[in-house]
Swiss-Prot record:
Keywords assigned by UniProt, alphabetized: ATP-binding, Kinase, Nucleotide-binding, Transferase, Tyrosine-protein kinase
Catalytic activity: L-tyrosyl-[protein] + ATP = O-phospho-L-tyrosyl-[protein] + ADP + H(+)
EC number assigned by the record: 2.7.10.2
Ligand binding (ATP): I31, G32, S33, G34, A35, F36, G37, E38, V39, K62
Organism this protein belongs to: Caenorhabditis elegans
Domain of life where this protein originates: Eukaryota
Ranges for domain Protein kinase: 25-288
Name of the protein: Putative tyrosine-protein kinase C03B1.5
Record-linked InterPro entries: Kinase-like_dom_sf, Prot_kinase_dom, Protein_kinase_ATP_BS, STE20_Ser/Thr_kinase, Tyr_kinase_AS
Keyword tRNA processing annotated: no
Active site: D155 (proton acceptor)
GO molecular function: ATP binding; non-membrane spanning protein tyrosine kinase activity
Length: 328
């Protein structure tokens, strides 16, 4: 493994200050993986400033390997996530470590640890409208925040919404995020996001903004209630089959749900983003007032985990529960 002070590439130099993670950080367990790389739970034990006691800390470390030609994508992810991180419903991102290796670069992002993981478990279980209202209320708060900053998340799917051990919903993974300035440019050259959650304007290679996230929120709501992607009509579901649904102006049925939920969905379903609700407008929907409490969804989620035999490390004995924000 090579190490250097700076990458030869141009861009955000804070990302490319080449340095490995501190030796006292101990990656303890893999808690996630995918095409991007992997996420490790890290234990950090160090003396406090007075040298009187050991501080125990836990956080997540997202490790990404990529060719150096893609460095601008990682810089965009880090910059947009960092800009948006100061909100209760956005997963906090801290310091970034980077190293070079033969095939390119390895970036290690320090992230807040969300012990209950993503919403896959909730989606695969009996989910009540009040649970989904709680999720939506928290996410809309996060979306108002990032949209006010001129950022669109771009991939509002089940895998990218996390929950902490206290039951707080967190918007995560800004890999598809970008500024309105960039996304509003028409004729984008690529379709980004998760099939089923991608807004029609993105599928049609048009310019888009924060309202694309509201389309994703509507599909996320139905996904949680139905237990699968509501656009899925057969065994195989991919981008091409989703494009067909979009070309036919299809939208999943939601007529068997309560009136407040139907009204909420109606505000998010329009194929024309001009007539689709904004995050701020959606925040006033009656449906959100039917939300369960934080303690209710936390207890429900914990019961589901016990039923499934899931036992990720539980951060109850941690003296410090924070994310490093500077290189050490």
């Amino acid at each position: 493994m090579q190490s250097a002070q700076k990458s030869k590439t141009n861009g955000d130099t804070s990302l490319f200050l080449m340095k490995d993670i501190p030796q006292y950080w101990s990656p303890a367990l893999k808690i996630g993986s995918g095409a991007f790389g992997e996420v490790m739970l890290v234990h950090s034990d160090r003396l406090d400033a007075r040298g009187e006691q050991i501080l125990h800390n836990e956080f997540a470390l997202k490790v990404i390997r990529f060719p150096e030609c893609d460095y601008h994508k990682i810089i965009r992810e880090v910059n947009t996530h960092t800009l948006c991180r100061h909100h209760d419903n956005v997963l906090f991102i801290g310091s970034i470590y980077c190293q070079t290796f033969q095939q390119g670069l390895r970036v290690q992002m320090c992230l807040e640890y969300a012990a209950l993981s993503d919403l896959s478990l909730l989606a695969s279980s009996e989910t009540f409208e009040s649970h989904v209202a709680y999720i939506c209320k928290n996410l809309i708060s996060a979306l108002i925040h990032i949209h006010n900053l001129g950022i669109v998340h771009g991939d509002l799917s089940v895998k990218n919404i996390l929950m902490t051990h206290e039951g707080v919903v967190k918007l995560s993974d800004f890999g598809m995020a970008n500024t309105f300035e960039q996304t509003r440019k028409s004729k984008n050259q690529s379709i980004l996001g998760t099939p089923g959650f991608i807004a029609p304007e993105i599928i049609n290679l048009q310019g888009y903004d924060g309202k694309a996230d509201l389309w994703g929120l509507g599909i996320l709501s139905l996904f949680l209630l139905k237990g699968e992607n509501p656009f899925k009509k057969c065994t195989q579901f991919d981008l091409e089959s989703y494009k067909v649904s979009i070309s036919e102006s299809f939208y999943p049925d939601y007529s068997n749900y309560s009136t407040p939920l139907q009204e909420f969905m109606s505000s998010l379903k329009d194929y024309n983003p001009e007539f689709r609700s904004s995050a701020l407008h959606a925040s006033s929907q009656t449906y959100l007032k039917t939300s369960c409490s934080q303690s209710e969804i936390l207890n429900y989620y914990k019961r589901l985990r016990r039923t499934r035999g899931m036992d990720l490390p539980w951060p109850e004995e941690i003296h410090t529960f924070s994310v490093p924000v500077s290189l050490e």
